[in-house]
Amino acid sequence: MVDFRTYEVVKLEDVAEYARAKQGKIYPAGTSTLQISATRGEISFLSEQGYVHTKNVAIIPQAGIDPLYFNIAMQRNIDLFMHKYAIGINIQEHEVGKFPIYLHDYETQKAIVAMFRQLEHEMMVERDTVNVLKDLKNNMLSNMFV
């Protein structure tokens, strides 16, 4: 049963593998990245396999944790983490393991991911609508003084 109020708070090092990204290494889809050099806490997600810049830490969640949910959980807590562990504009690699993760059961993880995907879809539809209206406006303005 989906229950958003029941979760446990765990450290990243207990539920994921992490290491500074290596140049030329291909990381699997579902890898989250956290920029640790000259950063303001930028987190990204690999939706397909690819390379990760060496100023990032590549984070691969353990089996039983949805990779996109894991990324969402990281984005939720990045401000708290940065406030506590950032040293100037950098983060020490070993401190990444202390990142707090709010971990729901797998069914709830899937529900949260489905909601975020729906929101992303709706945002994309709205962006497309705005672009169509901009094109219409430009077309009308260019034809106004024919």
Please name every model-derived segment.
Residues 100-142, 146:
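Amphipathic alpha-helical segments
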Residues 5, 28, 94:
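Structured loop/turn residues at beta-strand edges in well-structured enzyme cores
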Residues 20, 78-79:
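Generic structural signal for secondary-structure transition and capping sites
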Residues 31-75, 92:
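A short beta-sheet element
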Residues 41-43, 80-86:
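Short amphipathic beta-strand starts and helix->beta connectors
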Residues 1-20, 103-106, 130-132:
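Non-catalytic DNA-recognition/assembly elements of restriction-modification systems
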Residues 51-57, 87-107:
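A short glycine-rich beta-alpha junction/loop motif
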Residues 21-26:
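Short, surface-exposed secondary-structure edge patches
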